[in-house]
Amino acid sequence: MDEWLAEFIKRTILKLPFSETVTILKAWGFLTESELQTFTFRYPKDVTATEVVRLCEAKNATVDHAAALDLVFNHAYSNKKSWTVYQMSKPSESENDLFDASEFKLQFKKSIHAVSKNVTLNFKQFGEALWIRIAWGTHNTRPNQYKATFAVYHSQTPYVFITGLGKACRPLMCQALVIAAKYSQIQEMELKSRCLESLKDIVFKRFNQPFSSHHSIPHEKALIPKIVDPRVIYENMREKDRVSHLTRETFGEGPLPKLELASYKLETMFRAESIMDGNLTAVNEPFRCVVKFSSPHLLEAIRSLAPAGIAEAPISTLLSCIPHKARNSFKITEKRGMHPTSSQTTNF
């Protein structure tokens, strides 16, 4: 086994939490149960990693075996990467009812190898999702196993979740996907997150949907608190009930998908009644700025704003629409053909 391959396997093992090492190695499937029992997993982790490499050398592990281990690791710890959603559209005329995984892999490989043969390409099925791993190389260098691209495709859906895709490789990757999946177009959605499962929940509409109501506020009867003790002072109970109702109506009551960031790009022109109002109005270039919101769990944070008294209820649709529009990056511009002294935000 080449030295660089042994080093790659060792580094992959060292990235594993010590308590999960055995679980990941079993999921890998390259080493048998009896082989795993021949040594003791112990600190420091370097000792365990060296022992695993020794077993791999004895079994003549190849780069495909190492790539399979990397796939298992990244599937188990997918939240260590930032994922972007791509959406395919306009299915081709060929039948797209039944998904043939073997045919998909064959067509994908053909598309990639037609342009570049110096790549490491591997597939692994995890439940309903087909994981694709590509390590890209050049004419002069071997494929970089440490900067591989990962794509997750659910058959018979137009969505692909991709991480680690450089601009130079994007056209080839997208072309291979649409050919293998029998679509004709693909585009990047404005939706990103470290939580792969939350991205799936959003595009597959698996998250808790807000309930519909025919009333903008709760019934009057629901707003009247029961007086248990006349000496108790109820402060703003009606307002609290109204905020609670609007929050449930907007976000629902169940858990929300986990996103970490939302960005809003503003592009507008300065308006004035006359050119004497300032030099900025005479500039043809629009004014641009970016506002970003970040949180370990952004949607839950937004849902808590009104009940906490930080924001008015209902929350602005610019924030509440994120899961329903399946995007967390927005561009706010002006409507065309409006009166030169007024503006209105659109395109969100």
UniProtKB/Swiss-Prot annotation:
Top-rank taxon, per record: Eukaryota
Taxonomic source organism: Xenopus laevis
Subcellular locations according to the entry: Nucleus; Chromosome, Centromere
Function of the protein: Probable component of a centromeric complex involved in assembly of kinetochore proteins, mitotic progression and chromosome segregation.
GO biological process annotation, one example: chromosome segregation
Family, as annotated: Belongs to the CENP-N/CHL4 family.
Keywords of this entry: Centromere, Chromosome, Nucleus
Protein name: Centromere protein N-A
InterPro entries on file: CENP-NAC/CAD_complex, Chl4/mis15/CENP-N
Taxonomic path: Eukaryota, Metazoa, Chordata, Craniata, Vertebrata
Gene name linked to the record: cenpn-a
One cellular component (GO) term of this entry: nucleoplasm
